[in-house]
Amino acid sequence: MAEFTSAEKVNIGYENEYSTDAMTGGPDKRRQLYYQLIRSMKKVESVDIIVSFLMESGVRMLLKELEHTLKRGAKIRILTGNYLGITQPSALYLIKRKLGDRVDLRFYCEKGRSFHPKSYIFHYTDYSELYIGSSNI
């Protein structure tokens, strides 16, 4: 398997090149997680979102693209939890109200165990993308 430094670009046969750099925000959209998530959803066949917290504001930011992704026939699975009591019930209700059963929404709740992942996995025909890090929705 090839190894890349953080400054190298990887061309994986998609419209644009992807950087293996960390996404930190700033004025360059390519370094913003939000931009990458939206871009990745445009041609995905399925997406798995695994985050410890869901906030209504974050769901609202992604809602239109989630709707478009579903309309194209892609599958969306979301796994979240109530670790530290931070997930907002209004975020869960918003997903169910707007996207209904078209989204597989699951809730991890095991007393005494932490649940703190932040992963976005995009599955395409020939490859998958994975974003991991510190951003919740």
Where are these regions (language model features)?
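PLD/PLD-like phosphodiesterase catalytic module centered on the HKD motif
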Residues: 1-137
